[in-house]
C-alpha cells in the first residue's frame, strides 16, 4: 500500500471522502507504537500498540455475529477493570482459527506483559507488574487463515522499544494507517469539550470499508479520552451513542466476525466525579462523544469499497423507532436501490419496493418520499408536477439524501450507506488474489 503522506497531511477537502484530517496531538496517558510485522507480502505498517502506562478504564461493544473471532473471545474473558495495552493487527482476522488462534493471543499477551513490566521498571518511579489479563486485542483481515502468532510475537519487542510517550498528528495518522485493510483513507477524528469546568479531549480512529452492517459497531473503532470516567459510565455512554452512529451504517449488509468499538479513559484530567449519565456535567461530553462516533462512522461509509456516492436515508414521522430503522435499512441494503444510485437512475420505484419488503405495515395514503428537496411521492401518489429530468440531475451529486415520511407518529431513524459499483465487485473478487 503506497501512501503519500503529503496528500494526507495537506489534503484537498472532499465532502464525499471526508479526507479533511484533524490535528490530533498529545493526549495524556496514551502512548502509541507502530511497526511492520511483515503480515503482508509487501512491507507496510500492520501492527499497532496503544499503551496506557497508568492503566485506563474502558468499555467495549462487540459483534453480534454468531461466529466471532478469537480476539473477541479473548477480550470478553478479560475481567480487569483497567487495561494496560491494546494491540491491533491488520491482514489476519484470527477468526475461524479455533484454539490455536486463541493460544496465539495468550502467547502474545504473555510476551507483551513481560516486556511492558520491564519498561515500567525502567521508566516509572513506582513500577507495576502488568498482567496478560490487562491486554486486549483487535484483529482485522482475512477470515480462516492461520494466525501469524510468531511474526506478531517477534515484533512485540520492537513495538515496546518504539513506544512514543508524546504523540503528534503524524503518529496518530500512522496508527490509523496501520490498522487499515481495504480502506483507502485513514479515519481520525477529535473533539474537545468540558466536564464541569475541566477541558477534556476525545480522540478516535477507525477502520472499515467492506463487510459493514451494524449489529453493534460494524468495524474497528477506538476512542481515547483523558477524562476521568468509570467503566460503568463509559459503558453506558458507548451503548447509548453507538445506536445512532456505528449501528446506523451499512456498506454491503454483511456483519463481520471481528467488529468492536472501544473507549478508553486515562483519567489524567481530574474532572468532577460522574455517577450517572443523566448528570448535567456529562452532557457536553456525551454530545462530543456522539459527534466523534458519528464522524468516524460516516467516514467508514464514505470510504466504502468502490463507493462513488454517500447516501443518507431519513425515515421520519414513524410510530416507533424500530419500524423506522427497519425501513431505513431495507432501503440501505437493497442492491437494486444502490445500483440505481450508482447509475444515477432516478428509479424511485425501487425505494417503494424496499419499503414494502421491510415487513412494516404502511398506510399508503400517508406515505411521502423526497430525493433531496424534490418531492416525488405525496400522500401515496406521484406528484402532479413530477419531472424525471430534475431528479436525474439531482442523482449526479456525490451526496444523495432520501427522505421517507410515514406520517404515523413522531419517531425517526437515519441510516447511512453507499452506492454499489463495479469497483466494489472488482475489490472483493480480487481480495485474496
Q: What is the predicted role of each segment?
A:
Residues 2-107, 113-433:
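A structural signal for small-residue-enriched, beta-sheet-centric alpha/beta enzyme cores
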Amino acid at each position: 500500500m503506497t501512501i503519500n503522506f503529503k496528500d494526507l497531511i495537506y489534503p484537498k477537502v472532499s465532502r464525499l471522502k471526508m479526507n479533511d484530517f484533524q490535528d490530533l496531538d498529545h493526549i495524556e496517558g496514551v502512548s502509541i507504537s507502530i511497526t511492520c510485522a511483515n503480515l503482508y507480502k509487501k512491507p507496510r505498517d500492520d501492527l499497532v500498540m496503544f499503551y496506557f502506562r497508568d492503566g485506563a478504564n474502558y468499555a467495549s461493544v462487540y459483534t453480534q455475529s454468531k461466529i466471532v473471532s478469537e480476539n473477541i473471545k479473548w477480550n470478553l474473558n478479560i475481567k480487569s477493570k483497567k487495561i494496560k495495552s491494546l494491540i491491533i493487527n491488520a491482514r489476519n482476522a484470527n477468526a475461524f482459527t479455533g484454539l490455536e488462534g486463541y493460544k496465539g493471543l495468550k502467547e502474545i499477551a504473555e510476551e507483551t506483559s513481560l516486556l511492558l513490566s520491564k519498561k515500567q521498571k525502567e521508566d516509572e518511579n513506582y513500577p507495576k507488574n502488568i498482567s496478560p489479563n490487562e491486554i486486549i486485542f483487535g484483529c482485522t483481515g482475512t477470515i480462516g487463515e492461520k494466525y501469524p502468532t510468531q511474526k506478531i510475537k517477534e515484533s512485540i519487542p520492537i513495538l515496546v522499544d518504539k513506544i512514543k510517550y508524546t504523540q503528534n498528528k503524524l503518529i496518530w495518522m500512522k496508527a490509523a494507517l496501520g490498522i487499515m485493510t481495504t480502506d483507502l483513507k485513514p479515519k481520525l477524528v477529535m473533539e474537545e469539550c468540558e466536564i464541569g469546568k475541566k477541558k477534556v479531549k476525545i480522540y478516535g480512529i477507525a477502520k472499515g470499508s467492506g463487510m459493514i452492517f451494524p449489529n453493534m459497531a460494524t468495524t474497528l473503532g477506538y476512542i481515547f479520552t483523558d477524562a476521568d470516567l468509570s467503566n460503568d459510565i463509559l459503558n453506558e455512554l458507548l451503548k447509548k451513542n453507538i445506536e445512532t452512529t456505528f449501528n446506523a451504517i451499512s456498506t454491503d449488509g454483511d456483519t463481520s466476525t471481528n467488529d468492536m468499538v472501544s473507549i478508553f479513559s486515562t483519567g489524567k484530567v481530574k474532572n468532577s466525579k460522574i455517577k450517572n449519565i443523566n448528570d448535567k456535567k456529562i452532557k457536553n461530553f456525551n454530545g462530543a462523544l456522539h459527534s466523534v462516533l458519528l464522524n468516524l462512522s460516516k467516514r467508514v461509509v464514505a470510504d466504502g469499497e468502490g463507493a462513488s456516492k454517500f447516501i443518507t436515508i431519513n425515515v421520519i414521522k414513524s410510530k416507533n423507532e424500530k419500524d423506522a430503522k427497519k425501513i431505513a435499512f431495507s432501503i440501505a441494503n437493497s442492491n437494486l436501490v444502490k445500483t440505481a444510485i450508482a447509475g444515477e437512475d432516478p428509479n424511485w420505484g425501487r425505494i417503494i419496493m424496499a419499503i414494502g419488503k421491510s415487513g412494516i405495515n404502511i398506510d399508503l395514503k400517508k406515505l411521502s418520499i423526497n430525493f433531496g428537496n424534490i418531492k416525488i411521492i405525496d400522500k401515496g401518489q406521484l406528484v402532479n408536477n413530477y419531472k424525471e429530468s430534475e431528479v436525474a440531475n439531482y442523482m449526479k451529486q456525490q451526496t444523495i439524501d432520501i427522505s421517507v415520511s410515514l406520517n404515523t407518529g413522531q419517531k425517526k431513524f437515519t441510516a447511512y450507506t453507499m452506492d454499489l459499483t463495479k469497483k466494489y465487485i472488482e475489490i472483493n473478487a480480487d481480495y485474496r488474489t
